[in-house]
Amino acid sequence: MKKVLVYVEGQTEETFVRDVLDPHLSLQGIYLKPILARTKRTRSGTVFKGGILSYKQVRRDVLRLLEDSSAVQVTTMMDYYGLPDDFPGKAEVPVGTPYQRVAFLEDAFRRDIDHPRFLPFLTLHEFEALLFAQPEQIVQAFSDPPKAASQLVEEVSRLSPEEINEGNDTHPAARILRYLPG
């Protein structure tokens, strides 16, 4: 079985890698191990996980993962939306399609890490946007859905993926937390 370490930015991505991708790829002899981004460690040793605060943190974590010689590949699953300002290439992103901008940043990331086993992956739209592919499924996920779930579905049903993914207060995770906190 070939081990691939997947550096993920949040719990949603971690769950997706563990519960969806890994079982599927294990049939082909590939074991995916999600590694959740660490945001800080206190003096007492408590580690806080989830979220990308700086590229310095990402770089340190990815280089540490590459020290695991039992992994055939190290990759990432991070949202293009909200990358930190110090991310490689972010200040020089060319005008072009969103796909071209993502490809440019992935290449800058790959060149900065500069390791043959590193394959960066940035998701163009926040991963949580997949939850809105069939918004009515959000309500069906609850045995006793709160009224807020229906309000969320009504709101996002009128929007395109680009509109759902726009801004600090309107990106998918923010919308979900606003209607369904906790």
Language model region names:
Residues 50-51, 55:
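Non-catalytic terminal and connector segments of soluble metabolic enzymes
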Residues 6-15:
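Catalytic nucleophile-elbow at a beta strand-turn-alpha helix junction centered on a G-D-S/GDSL motif
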Residues 1, 14-45, 56-182:
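C-terminal accessory helical subdomains adjacent to catalytic cores in phosphodiester-
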